[in-house]
């Protein structure tokens, strides 16, 4: 029983939407914590506004509030629910910052709520740069020379005394937001100015740079009885100066001597004890490669990205144990769930090497600066487990899904040596491949080490890989060479490319020689005790530890790393699928490689293969397990793209067939199907060459929408207005999906509508219709969406239902399908179809109460919807409103274009739910950082094509009492219309934005994309200084309606459980 007898109900704070620096790792840790507390008989109340997470499902916490985690909202929840404790160390920086505010504003004391786990004082000491420095000095732990400043003058004074380079770290921020490395006064002024604005308390730390030192991390655990253990040591491949979230990380540490390891381990334990942290904590060190000198960089007094990595690397469930410690249990009282025999009071032992590689969004942002530094830019990451560093690294590279199957890339191979050397000289997303190419060209390791400061041990391992490439190239693929290459982690595809043969030839040859992977268990104790959980990785040339049982089982293919266009929503679907299979009495197997997610938790499925999602790796597991079949509909485009190869290798696909998937994914075949079904579609044609595209453009007229086949998140999808733009974009898009046609559509300036449905081939259930606020042309993932749809006539709704049924039956869909429509002047057009789970499945499941994934799994296994209690057609709509709002991470990506278009840019989403439409929209806007104050100054800079909409907008703003400023061209147009506003230059507008003069910016781009355009700079400044920015006229109009009509005090604060009850009463009358 927990030590704290008085803690029966706990409020857990979630981390909110997925943004760079705070991703799915907090869904994983939060889910684990909620389950862990419930195991101890504690009632769990959760607040989190991210609908795409597993943790916001009502079967994880007892009571779930999908509300914005603000002080006022959380106070209302505390007043209503009266929890005895609050757990904030599992909600990332969001949770931590909120807990600090609740404590400082006296709310926790007012309601007698105990801050569980790490105390307020410990959080303050670890997060406040000056207090932390003092505490380290007090216990004799070295910290770099630094000063905490609240103004630019003090920063410049420090620079004068200590020289450059300097590292700037704002207090209470995440992912290095607002930080950077300054090499001169100008850079220092710019970074400090921004950092002060980003910090919750308006202070930044300026410290002497330790650039080039080794960065080492320790994950440590402590309980209230002062018992301490280190769970995992991790080494950054990149030296200090690159944010750990943007660095390749290896566990356990590889290049430390035993003396260095013990020195840093002892320091870690000393630090966690001094800070009195109860639970998990991450400590980062800088170690001088030339001596035993080290400095403490920082401490995260909470579960972090590194904790998720350490959990998956060791099998030790950090968040689960941390939650139990928070309610008073000691480490020696908690059972280790992996072995089932030992307690949690032990240090995991690893007999393998783990490598994490970040996944960056540069494929979506062509203009952004690809350099990496102290401010994180990666959206996600992959992890690989193998017996050697070389094999682990190569496995991680092929998990990234960047068309790299080893360290050889054609575009890098084609570069001149001076370009390669330039690429090595600064940290960037491609540096690993540049280094490998430099080694191929016999560039000296000492030189590479001198330039990159990457340890020679790692560089020599890369050289081993390069030498193996040479050996494969020169040899006849003998059994010996193949075995050696496979043991080093080479994929069949990489070997085939080096030899100029087909991948299937290598696979056949390998099988002829009897070379198969063997599978090993992750057991936390280097096989000292038998593992009761099924957490597996592959290797070559070793004994296989995994027994195959003869029971019915199904493989679910996961969605890999989080990236723009394929986020946590697909992990939600994978997890729900695993649970549905278990409920159906079928063993569930998941293949995935993302260390941040719930799907890769050791007990989510019956068996977890932590492997790359490539044809080779999936086929190996399929052949070993011999399941009933494979489910590809939950793993996003990652899984869908494997279908063709799986079917060719006689793998049974459960659910919609490959033929149907191919029809809907291939633009030309799909267009033909719609014509046969007599369904409206935008006028269009397909092109394979630039010449085709030019002819089509001239025939259809502008504006046009270009879409490639088989891509995610609208990658390379563009709205084009001129012939030159079409020539530029077709050249780019052809590279995205080789050999697949590009569809060129006439752009429809209408409302966009979206439907997710479940079909069994005969019966088609539509849980709801979502309507987008922004017109067609803005990617659905970047649109505000409303459920139930508000502006559709009965005739339009009936057409949408009819089209959904016709398409689902024609494609014989067995499972989930997502269809996007445009509606203009009463005509409904079909824009696209995805015969799989979409990113709106989680939110629609939560909004309507229809268990979409569970139904899709049952249908894929052969059941009919009627047997499951559902009928064809539209499910009764809810008497409340749900609004999905996109959330962007633009402030982290220098030089990225922020305006909306057909290519997706958002990293996450939040949900606003309320009994009124205006209330739900207001909550969604606030959660997305677009809250407009009731009064204030608004800046307008509008593109000419939108001028006709400006007068009514300005009149609305003025009637609400806003003071309006406009840039020259917009102001001049308004003046001609007889409307008077304050007119300023763009340059002056940017200066005033930096000074915090404006409360919101409305700017629709003219050209966009070019960082030297003034409009581009205006949008970037608004984003970087966190001023609400609207780049779509539709969004701002909807926002103003919400602001005008909403009574903030009248917003309903109900749990999802209460909304579900309202909907159950609503559906009760439905006769099936």
Curated annotation (Swiss-Prot):
Mg(2+) 1 binds at residues 284, 298. The keyword rRNA-binding does not apply. Mg(2+) 3 binds at residues 820, 832. Pathway: Amino-acid biosynthesis; L-arginine biosynthesis; carbamoyl phosphate from bicarbonate: step 1/1; Pyrimidine metabolism; UMP biosynthesis via de novo pathway; (S)-dihydroorotate from bicarbonate: step 1/3. Residues 1-401 are annotated as: Carboxyphosphate synthetic domain. This is Carbamoyl phosphate synthase large chain. ATP 2 binds at residues 707, 746, 748, 752, 777-780, 820, 832. SUPFAM superfamilies: Carbamoyl phosphate synthetase, large subunit connection domain, Glutathione synthetase ATP-binding domain-like, Methylglyoxal synthase-like, PreATP-grasp domain.
């Amino acid at each position: 029983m927990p030590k704290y007898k008085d803690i029966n109900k706990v409020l857990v704070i979630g981390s909110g939407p997925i943004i760079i620096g705070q991703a799915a790792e907090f869904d994983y840790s939060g889910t684990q914590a909620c389950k862990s507390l419930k195991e101890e008989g504690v009632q769990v109340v959760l607040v989190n506004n991210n609908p795409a997470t597993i943790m916001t499902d009502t079967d994880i916490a007892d009571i779930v509030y999908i509300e914005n985690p603000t002080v006022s909202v959380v106070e209302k929840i505390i007043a209503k629910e009266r929890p005895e404790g609050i757990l904030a160390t599992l909600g990332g920086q969001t949770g931590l910052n909120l807990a600090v505010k609740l404590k400082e504003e006296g709310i926790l004391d007012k309601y007698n709520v105990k801050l569980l786990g790490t105390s307020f004082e410990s959080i303050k000491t670890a997060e406040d740069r000056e207090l932390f420095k003092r505490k380290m000095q007090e216990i004799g732990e070295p910290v770099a020379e630094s000063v905490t400043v609240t103004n630019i003058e003090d920063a410049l004074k420090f620079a004068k005394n200590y020289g450059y380079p300097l590292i700037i770290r704002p207090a209470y921020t995440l992912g290095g937001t607002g930080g950077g490395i300054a090499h001169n006064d100008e850079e220092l002024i710019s970074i400090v100015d921004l950092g002060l604005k980003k910090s919750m308390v308006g202070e930044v730390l300026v410290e002497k740079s330790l650039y080039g030192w080794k960065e080492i991390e320790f994950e440590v655990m402590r309980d209230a009885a002062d018992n301490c253990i280190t769970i995992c040591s991790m080494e950054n491949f990149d030296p200090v100066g690159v944010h750990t979230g943007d660095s390749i990380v290896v566990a356990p540490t590889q290049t430390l001597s035993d003396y260095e390891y013990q020195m840093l381990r002892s320091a870690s334990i000393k630090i966690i004890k001094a800070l009195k942290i109860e639970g998990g904590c991450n400590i980062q060190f800088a170690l001088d490669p030339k001596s035993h000198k080290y400095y403490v960089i920082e401490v995260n007094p909470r579960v972090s990205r590194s904790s998720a990595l350490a959990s998956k690397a060791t099998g030790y469930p950090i968040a689960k144990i941390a939650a139990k410690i928070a309610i008073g249990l000691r480490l020696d009282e908690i059972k280790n769930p992996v072995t089932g025999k030992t307690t949690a009071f032990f240090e995991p032992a690893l007999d393998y090497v783990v490598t994490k590689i970040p996944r960056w969004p540069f494929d979506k942002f062509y203009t952004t600066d690809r350099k990496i530094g102290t401010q994180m830019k990666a959206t996600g990451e992959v992890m690989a487990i193998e017996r050697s560093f070389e094999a682990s690294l190569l496995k991680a590279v092929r998990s990234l899904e960047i068309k790299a199957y080893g360290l050889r890339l054609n575009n890098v191979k084609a570069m001149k040596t001076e370009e390669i050397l330039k690429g090595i000289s600064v940290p960037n997303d491609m540096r690993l491949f540049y280094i490998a190419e430099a080694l191929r060209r016999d560039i000296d390791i000492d030189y590479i080490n001198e330039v990159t400061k990457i340890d020679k041990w790692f560089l020599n391992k890369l050289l081993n890989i390069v030498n193996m490439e040479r050996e494969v190239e020169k040899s006849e693929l003998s059994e010996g060479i193949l075995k050696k290459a496979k043991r080093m982690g080479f994929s069949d595809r990489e070997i085939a490319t080096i030899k100029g043969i087909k991948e299937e030839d290598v696979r056949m040859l390998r099988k002829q020689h009897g070379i198969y992977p063997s599978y090993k268990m992750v057991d936390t104790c280097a096989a000292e005790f038998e593992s009761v959980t099924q957490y597996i990785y592959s290797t070559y040339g070793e004994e296989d530890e995994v027994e195959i049982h003869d029971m019915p089982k199904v493989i679910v293919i996961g969605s890999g790393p989080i990236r723009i266009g394929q986020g946590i929503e697909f992990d939600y679907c994978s997890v729900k699928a695993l649970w549905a299979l278990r409920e159906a009495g079928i063993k569930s197997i998941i293949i995935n490689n993302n260390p941040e997610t719930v799907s890769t938790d050791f007990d989510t499925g019956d068996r977890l293969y932590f492997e790359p999602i490539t044809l080779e790796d999936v086929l190996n597991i399929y052949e070993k397990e011999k399941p009933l079949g494979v489910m590809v509909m939950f793993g996003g485009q990652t899984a869908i793209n494997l279908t063709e190869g799986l079917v060719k290798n006689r793998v049974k696909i459960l659910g919609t067939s490959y033929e149907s998937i191919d029809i809907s994914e291939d633009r030309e075949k799909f267009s033909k199907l719609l014509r046969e079904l007599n369904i409206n579609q935008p006028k269009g044609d397909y092109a394979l060459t630039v010449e085709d595209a030019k002819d089509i453009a001239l025939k259809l007229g502008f504006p046009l929408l270009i879409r490639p086949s088989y891509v995610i998140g609208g990658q390379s999808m563009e709205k084009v207005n001129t012939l030159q733009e079409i020539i530029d974009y077709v050249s780019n898009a052809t590279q995205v999906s080789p050999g697949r046609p590009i569809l060129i559509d006439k752009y429809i300036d209408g409302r966009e509508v979206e439907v997710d449905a479940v079909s069994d081939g005969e019966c088609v259930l539509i849980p709801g219709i979502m309507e987008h606020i922004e017109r067609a042309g803005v990617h659905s993932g970047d649109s505000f969406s409303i459920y139930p749809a508000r502006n559709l006539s009965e005739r339009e709704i009936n057409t949408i239902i009819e089209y959904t049924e016709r398409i689902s039956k024609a494609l014989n869909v067995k499972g989930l399908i997502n269809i996007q429509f445009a509606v203009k002047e009463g005509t409904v057009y079909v824009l696209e179809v995805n015969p799989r789970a979409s990113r709106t499945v989680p939110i629609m499941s939560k909004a309507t109460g229809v268990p979409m994934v569970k139904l899709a799994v049952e249908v894929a296994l052969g059941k009919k919807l009627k047997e499951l209690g559902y009928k064809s057609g539209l499910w009764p709509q809810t008497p409340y409103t749900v609004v999905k709002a996109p959330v962007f991470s633009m402030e982290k990506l220098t030089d990225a274009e922020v305006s909306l278009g057909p290519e997706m840019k958002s990293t996450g989403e939040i949900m606003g739910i309320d009994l009124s439409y205006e209330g739900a929209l207001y909550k969604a806007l606030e959660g997305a950082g677009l809250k407009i104050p009731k009064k204030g100054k608004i800046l307008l800079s509008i593109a000419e094509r939108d001028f006709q909409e400006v007068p009514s907008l300005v009149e609305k703003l003025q009637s609400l009492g806003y003071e309006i400023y406009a840039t020259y061209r917009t102001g001049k147009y308004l003046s001609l219309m007889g409307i008077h506003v304050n007119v300023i230059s763009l340059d002056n507008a940017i200066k005033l934005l930096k000074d915090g003069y404006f409360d919101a910016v409305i700017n629709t781009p003219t050209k966009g994309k070019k960082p030297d355009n003034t409009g581009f700079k205006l949008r970037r400044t608004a984003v970087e200084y966190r001023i609400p920015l609207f780049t779509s006229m539709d969004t701002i109009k909807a926002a103003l309606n919400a602001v005008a009509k909403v009574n903030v005090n009248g917003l309903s604060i109900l749990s999802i459980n209460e909304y579900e009850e309202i909907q159950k009463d609503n559906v009760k009358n439905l006769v099936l």
